[in-house]
Structure formats: C-alpha cells, structure tokens
Amino acid sequence: MALDAAVKQSIIKEYATGEGDTGSPEVQVAVLTQRIKDLTEHMKEHKHDYHTQRGLLAMVGRRKRMLSYLKKTDIARYRALIERLGLRR
C-alpha cells in the first residue's frame, strides 16, 4: 500500500529540515510511521495477509534502525521526533 502523493508531500513538508529535504532521518521516519499506521489498519481487517505482514515487519525494523541511528548521532533531534510522532519510547 503506497501513500497518496499529497499525504506524502504534506508529511515531507512538515518534517523537512530544509527546502527540498526528503532524506533526513526525521522525514524518513515520519513517512515510514504513516505507512506503518496504514498497514496496521489493513492488517486489522485482513488478518491472514501474510505478505503484507512481512512487509509491515520490515518497515518497523527499518524505522527502528533509523531511530537508533538518530539517537546515536543527535539525541535532541531524536527526542523531538519521538515527541512529535507520539511513538512510545
């Protein structure tokens, strides 16, 4: 399930650190978080969709690694991002 282009652009605009920023950890984690939320809703209806479940777990792992990187490099940005996204950490 891909994100709608308008939704993705609004997330990028909200979390970007500068003009044209799409690759910063904050933006990547925010986009992944939205995709994870969407797939979680999909999985509630389709419990036996194992292909989606595997992709969802891969996204969660990727987000976890990005958050770990951000925590190691800049703890203040990490804490601010966790607070903004409402993640339980």
Curated annotation (Swiss-Prot):
Subunit organization: Part of the 30S ribosomal subunit. Forms a bridge to the 50S subunit in the 70S ribosome, contacting the 23S rRNA.
Q: What is this protein called?
A: Small ribosomal subunit protein uS15
Sorted alphabetically, the keyword list is:
Ribonucleoprotein, Ribosomal protein, RNA-binding, rRNA-binding
Q: Give the family per the record.
A: Belongs to the universal ribosomal protein uS15 family.
Q: What does this protein do?
A: One of the primary rRNA binding proteins, it binds directly to 16S rRNA where it helps nucleate assembly of the platform of the 30S subunit by binding and bridging several RNA helices of the 16S rRNA. Forms an intersubunit bridge (bridge B4) with the 23S rRNA of the 50S subunit in the ribosome.
Organism ancestry = Bacteria, Bacillati, Actinomycetota, Actinomycetes, Micrococcales
Which PANTHER family does the annotation name?
A: RIBOSOMAL PROTEIN S15, BACTERIAL AND ORGANELLAR, SMALL RIBOSOMAL SUBUNIT PROTEIN US15M
- The highest taxon in the source lineage is Bacteria
Its GO CC terms are:
cytosolic small ribosomal subunit
Q: Which GO terms describe its biological process?
A: translation
From the UniProt record, which GO molecular function terms apply? rRNA binding; structural constituent of ribosome
